[in-house]
Amino acid sequence: MDCKSEESAQRTDSQAFQEPDGLPEAGGEDGLSESFQLLQVDVEYERPEETSPANSAVWSSKNMQRKQRHWERIVSSKKSKRKQERERRKAKRAEDPGNGTCPQHSKRFLKALTKEKLLEAKHSGPRLCVDLSMTQHMSKKELSRLAGQIRRLYGSNKKASRPFWICLTGFSTASPLYEECLRMNDGFSAYLLDVTEEDCFSLFPLETLVYLTPDSEHSLEDIDQSTVYVIGGLVDESIQKKVTFQKAREYSVKTARLPIQEYMIKRQNEKNYHSEILAINQVFDILSTYFETRNWPEALKKGVSPGKGYVLQNSAEG
């Protein structure tokens, strides 16, 4: 029994010191070092995510540098574009020094300045009345065109250095035209002008009215601030003649026409078309320009487009 136990113990000890399969025999320190290196490679292959802190820090640092350079390029590009835009605006102001705006003025300041000018015109400026009492027979298309003309008229008056006070008469807030103005004109309900259902003949003393109509026998010579100038708010594609003239005659109101015949001549065109009928915003542009410059040729050039078949006398040869 003692001999068998001793042999069993020897076999156990022999197995305990047996080399692992696949590894080279332990041949001193070199063989042992080589074995540990192979084991280390296996461990790193099985867990590649375990990188050294030093390598991770280097990679993170390079990534941050790339992001920083990318961000700096974006910032530099934006600065360059802003500089170019400032230079473009500066050059534009140099080309047109009389545009009436200052770069240091904010939109809020300019809005307040415009409001102040318009309110001052209400008390001391010339008055312009747009007679909208003839819109009941106008089509939807004609109403839309008239709403657009009202918007352009108001826009021109806001930009004028000496604005008129505008009054829209015979204008019901329940009318299709009012709805069209709200639809087409942003902020229409906040326009600085008067809106009333009364017609101009009952709102103002008749002796203060001058109805502007192309059918009048009298030419408008000057603008008087004590006079209320009336424009017929009428867009009529069928071109009914003398509608506004007859209405003025009905109330025994003075009439006048723009001095187109005095300062302009007919120019030959393919359609042989010549007309003194203008949109209300074109009539206003002429009145506003004349009120600022006191120069009829300049004012007429502003409002009478070449399509009307008229040119200024001194430019007829062109």
From Swiss-Prot:
Basic and acidic residues biased stretches: 1-10, 84-96
EC number: 2.1.1.221
GO terms assigned for molecular function: tRNA (guanosine(9)-N1)-methyltransferase activity
Coiled-coil segments: 72-93
Cited CDD domains: Trm10euk_B
One annotated Gene Ontology cellular component of this protein: TIM22 mitochondrial import inner membrane insertion complex
The keyword Transferase appears for this protein: yes
Superkingdom: Eukaryota
Pfam families attached to this UniProt entry: tRNA_m1G_MT
Reactions performed catalytically: guanosine(9) in tRNA + S-adenosyl-L-methionine = N(1)-methylguanosine(9) in tRNA + S-adenosyl-L-homocysteine + H(+)
Composition skew (Polar residues), residue ranges: 52-63
Xref: PROSITE patterns: SAM_MT_TRM10
Protein keywords: Coiled coil, Methyltransferase, S-adenosyl-L-methionine, Transferase
GO BP annotations, alphabetical order: methylation; protein insertion into mitochondrial inner membrane
Biased composition (Basic residues): 64-83
Enzyme's top EC category: transferase
Segments forming domain SAM-dependent MTase TRM10-type: 114-311
Region entry Disordered, spans: 1-105
Family to which this protein belongs: Belongs to the class IV-like SAM-binding methyltransferase superfamily. TRM10 family.
Function: S-adenosyl-L-methionine-dependent guanine N(1)-methyltransferase that catalyzes the formation of N(1)-methylguanine at position 9 (m1G9) in tRNAs. Probably not able to catalyze formation of N(1)-methyladenine at position 9 (m1A9) in tRNAs.
Protein known as: tRNA methyltransferase 10 homolog B
Taxonomic source organism: Mus musculus
